[in-house]
Amino acid sequence: MALRMLWAGQAKGILGGWGIICLVMSLLLQHPGVYSKCYFQAQAPCHYEGKYFTLGESWLRKDCFHCTCLHPVGVGCCDTSQHPIDFPAGCEVRQEAGTCQFSLVQKSDPRLPCKGGGPDPEWGSANTPVPGAPAPHSS
């Protein structure tokens, strides 16, 4: 119902400019699969690749950002991709061509998926402990 009011242009009087921004940004942040960064561009035009969008309409950019038109105040976008951040040193992240999906592959042979090894407390980019591994001893 609220979106129907937005699309009909009736919400401006009820919610005001900031109310519209808050409503649409809360909807963006609740979008399934959105667990990464979001940003807002004030006064940005609501068009992408030659197509124009109206208030409340959204589109998916080639760089995996889901954007929503907040006309006349701007555009809000959130990254929909989920990038692995903690993985064995012998692996690397690859984006699957033409999609917003990522996978872990072996550095030595990117055609093969990443193999998990035994527990290694030094494992990963964040140097986080492996679940179930013994705690390091302090000296």
Curated annotation (Swiss-Prot):
Cellular component annotations (GO), alphabetically ordered: cytoplasm; extracellular space
InterPro entries, per the entry: PSP94
Reported tissue expression: Detected in prostate epithelium (at protein level). Detected in trachea and testis. Highly expressed in benign prostatic hyperplasia and in some prostate cancers, and can also be detected in breast tumor tissue.
Signal peptide: 1-35
Disulfide bonds: 38-78, 46-69, 64-100, 67-77, 91-114
GO molecular function terms listed in the Swiss-Prot or TrEMBL record: CCR2 chemokine receptor binding; cytokine activity
Disordered: annotated span: 108-139
Single biological process term from Gene Ontology: lymphocyte chemotaxis
Aminoacyl-tRNA synthetase as UniProt keyword: no
Source species, domain of life: Eukaryota
Transmembrane segments: none
Stored Pfam families: PSP94
Subcellular location: Secreted
Family of the protein in this entry: Belongs to the beta-microseminoprotein family.
Function: Acts as a ligand for C-C chemokine receptor CCR2. Signals through binding and activation of CCR2 and induces a strong chemotactic response and mobilization of intracellular calcium ions. Exhibits a chemotactic activity for monocytes and lymphocytes but not neutrophils.
Protein name: Prostate-associated microseminoprotein
Organism of this sequence: Homo sapiens (Human)
This protein's encoding gene: MSMP
